[in-house]
UniProtKB/Swiss-Prot annotation:
This is Tubulin beta-2 chain. Cleaved by caspase ced-3 in vitro. One of its GO terms (cellular component) is tubulin complex. It is found in: Cytoplasm, Cytoskeleton. It comes from Caenorhabditis elegans.
Length: 450
């Protein structure tokens, strides 16, 4: 079957990663000890995508857990599903990366990376037909961002034809751990642009706003933010884990979602959003789900899709509902808001339906958008980066680990290029002379098609 190897790196990556495993284990009827106690065969039909069936009939996640300090790993191990993971798949150092990208990417992380690759190789060898990898990490710290991107490029070297997907938590001044987050994030994006096929941008600022505004939490904790992330991750992987036709593997998703190789940063959304504990008392209709799902307030990235245009969209509906109604509602949204979808990619919205809803809900919908409005998120980081970099603030922490200022300059300009590429396609119309306005990607793809 088509397996996915999951890697989680750093504190944030391990926290949202282990939450992801709790949620999907629950959805597939896998107990914390790895035994199956589910209700239907649907839960097992594609279980091998994420789990390995051991000799004793227990299911073991195809997960590799990485960190440069033991703390977070210990709490995962002592957590509710800690015994589910393969003990050999915990790989950790003792030094920590101290929120320094250079330590994660060049020094401390580089020392540990071969051990991690050994474990990843072992997992990959246990696969029948590996489709690709998914990494959970944050871009603001040292390990997830620095070592996470190092792992991505090493995996890319060894498995060049496999899909690489990442769930990347983008830093925000509202929920900030460290002052150097803009540096770490920019250096990471510089890597992700080149080395991932699909990146889900999960943005602490958006999560914070959802908790505060929609869920009415006055002091959102990381636990609350991670609860939202796990809903989203469970939603966007539904098609990969349950039987179905559309976007049923990582590559098909990439083919549908990525019109130009560098523009692979997605904005996820989820509906219905209701405060943790007070699950919606009434089931929403398909129309309400669709409405909510496209609402800017439900986006997990702090960008307003109304400030840009959608290149492509994928929507996943979960629960028992009429396919016809789903199709009607999705067409309805596109017709009413046609100006927000680029007209030069016809049929750029794809919909999938899965019968099994998430726990506690009758129906739910997950949204994945490739919108040019994502440039707002990169602009925000870029401005903060430039403010500090102009004064060379905090640079000694990075140059002390052997980095060169040149690398900062390159990362900065790569991110600014990305922003202007999004802008260029936002303004493009179907009538534009394709060769003329884009010497780069659009021109090439256009010529090669003929």
């Amino acid at each position: 079957m088509r397996e996915i190897v999951h890697v989680q790196a750093g504190q944030c990556g391990n926290q949202i990663g282990s939450k992801f495993w709790e949620v999907i284990s629950d959805e597939h009827g896998i107990q914390p000890d790895g035994t199956f106690k589910g209700e239907t065969d649907l839960q097992l039909e594609r279980i091998d995508v994420y789990y390995n069936e051991a000799n004793n009939g227990k299911y073991v996640p195809r997960a590799v857990l990485v960190d440069l300090e033991p703390g977070t790993m210990d709490s995962v191990r002592s957590g509710p599903f800690g015994q589910l993971f393969r003990p050999d798949n915990f790989v950790f150092g003792q030094s920590g990366a101290g929120n320094n990208w250079a330590k994660g990417h060049y020094t401390e992380g580089a020392e540990l990376v071969d051990n991690v690759l050994d474990v990843i190789r072992k997992e990959a060898e246990g696969c029948d037909c590996l489709q690709g990898f998914q990494l959970t990490h944050s871009l603001g710290g040292g390990t997830g961002s620095g070592m996470g991107t190092l792992l991505i490029s090493k995996i890319r070297e060894e498995y060049p034809d496999r899909i690489m997907s990442s769930f990347s938590v983008v830093p925000s001044p509202k929920v900030s751990d460290t002052v150097v987050e803009p540096y770490n994030a920019t250096l990471s994006v510089h890597q992700l642009v080149e080395n991932t096929d699909e990146t889900y941008c999960i943005d602490n600022e958006a999560l914070y706003d959802i908790c505060y505004r929609t869920l009415k939490l006055t002091n959102p904790t990381y636990g609350d933010l991670n609860h939202l992330v796990s809903l989203t991750m469970s939603g966007v992987t539904t098609c990969l884990r349950f039987p179905g036709q559309l976007n049923a593997d990582l590559r098909k998703l990439a083919v549908n979602m990525v019109p130009f190789p560098r523009l692979h940063f997605f904005m996820p959304g989820f509906a219905p959003l209701s405060a943790k504990g007070t699950q919606a008392y009434r089931a929403l209709t398909v129309a309400e789900l669709t409405q909510q799902m496209f609402d800017a307030k439900n986006m997990m990235a702090a960008c307003d899709p109304r400030h840009g245009r959608y290149l492509t969209v994928a929507a996943m509906f979960r629960g028992r509902m009429s396919m016809r109604e789903v199709d009607e509602q999705m067409l309805n949204v596109q017709n009413k808001n046609s100006s927000y979808f680029v007209e030069w990619i016809p049929n750029n919205v794809k919909t999938a339906v899965c019968d099994i809803p998430p726990r506690g809900l009758k129906m739910a919908a997950t949204f994945v958008g490739n919108s040019t409005a994502i440039q707002e998120l990169f602009k925000r980081i870029s401005e903060q980066f430039t403010a500090m970099f102009r004064r060379k603030a905090f640079l000694h922490w990075y140059t002390g680990e052997g980095m060169d200022e040149m690398e900062f300059t390159e990362a900065e300009s790569n991110m600014n290029d990305l922003i202007s590429e999004y802008q260029q396609y936002q303004e493009a119309t179907a009538e534009d002379d394709v060769d003329g306005y884009a010497e780069g990607e659009a021109g090439e793809t256009y010529e090669s098609e003929q």
